[in-house]
């Protein structure tokens, strides 16, 4: 069987890709050059897992406390990368705070509702204030029986922001 390439990215498209940006980041940090070759990056990540995962954390600008500890195992999926690092999902999710669209909701009747990042942040902040007023705290559990609405997402994010555990159906 002869395989035919169906599509190939143009140079300007490659240069706008996240892989290209990550390549530039790796070169600036480690002087490692992958020249837009995925297999080169794959081999490097396997050979240097500690550097790879640390660089992914830095490149994606994760907010939190990074511990570069690596607990290796002979069984790949049992490796523990960045062990004991700490981050807050909500803090990372809500790093944007402008008027661009954050969430679009469309119900079964076709009614559409949007939230901007600014609105999402404001609503989550209000919920956090409320949750704290009722003494909800880290490791508490919140179980909800709610429909798939923007307000449900906001409640989940606010719960996560204070370190509580969210469960819904």
Sequence positions of predicted segments:
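Conserved AMP-binding/adenylate-forming core of the ANL superfamily
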Residues: 40-44, 103-157
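Flexible, non-catalytic linker and terminal segments flanking ANL/adenylate-forming cores
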Residues: 1-92
């Amino acid at each position: 069987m002869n395989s035919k390439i169906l599509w190939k990215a143009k140079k300007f498209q490659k240069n706008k890709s996240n892989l290209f940006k990550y390549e530039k980041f790796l070169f600036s940090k480690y002087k490692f050059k992958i020249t837009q070759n995925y297999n080169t990056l794959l081999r490097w990540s396997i050979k240097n897992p500690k550097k790879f995962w640390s660089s992914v954390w830095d490149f994606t600008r994760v907010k939190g406390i990074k511990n570069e500890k690596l607990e290796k195992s002979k069984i790949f999926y049992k490796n523990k990368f960045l062990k004991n690092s700490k981050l807050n999902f909500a803090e990372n999710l809500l790093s944007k705070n402008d008027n661009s669209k954050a969430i679009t909701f469309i119900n079964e009747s076709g009614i559409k509702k949007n939230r901007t990042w600014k609105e999402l942040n404001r609503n989550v902040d209000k919920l956090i204030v409320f949750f704290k007023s009722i003494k909800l705290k880290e490791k508490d559990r919140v179980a909800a029986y709610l429909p798939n609405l923007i307000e449900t997402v906001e409640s989940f994010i606010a719960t996560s922001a204070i370190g509580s555990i969210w469960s819904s159906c």
